[in-house]
A protein has these predicted regions:
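N-terminal alpha/beta PP-like core and its mobile active-site loop of ThDP/TPP-dependent enzymes
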Residues: 1-156
Length: 156
């Protein structure tokens, strides 16, 4: 099973009923697998704040996890107000973001949609979410998914 499939099944098992998102370059492989598998329906929206607010509303309405999926940098940063609001109100919203691959990250080149540093996005979300993870190691990814989803449920 691919990592994205494992993530989708874990989200569904923890009460997510759908994903709200906007496909973008760094997240396109994820979105392709979401559509291929059909584990959770994908609702594409036209503006990232709407993605965050829709995920928050879904979490509150259904009582499970709300899921927002966006691309790295500009896409994720555009969800900050909605995600911070959900965090303040203890609404369990999970944000899934694409990111540069290891080779791109190691290149030292400035990438489009990048903040001042490659980890700027991670640091911003550390301030407005109860848990964060980088799923870049298949050996630890399953445990990291479980840790983050458990934190989202328990701290809501």
């Amino acid at each position: 099973m691919r990592l994205t499939e494992a993530l989708l099944h874990a989200l569904a098992a923890d009460g997510a009923r759908e994903i709200f998102g906007i496909p973008g370059d760094f997240a396109l492989p994820y979105f392709r697998i979401v559509e291929e598998t059909g584990v959770l329906p994908l609702h594409t929206l036209s503006h990232e704040p709407g993605v965050g607010f829709a995920a928050d509303a879904a979490a509150r309405w259904h009582g499970g996890l709300g899921v927002a999926a966006v691309t790295y940098g500009a896409g994720a940063f555009n969800t900050v107000n909605a995600v911070a609001g959900a965090y303040a109100e203890k609404s369990p919203v999970v944000v899934i973001s694409g990111a540069p691959a290891r080779a791109e990250s190691a290149s030292g080149l400035l990438l489009h949609h990048q903040g001042p540093r490659l980890d700027s996005q991670f640091k911003v979300f550390a301030e407005i979410t109860c848990a964060q993870a980088r799923l870049d190691d298949p050996r630890t990814a399953t445990a990291e998914i479980r840790r983050v989803l458990t934190a989202a449920r328990e701290q809501a």
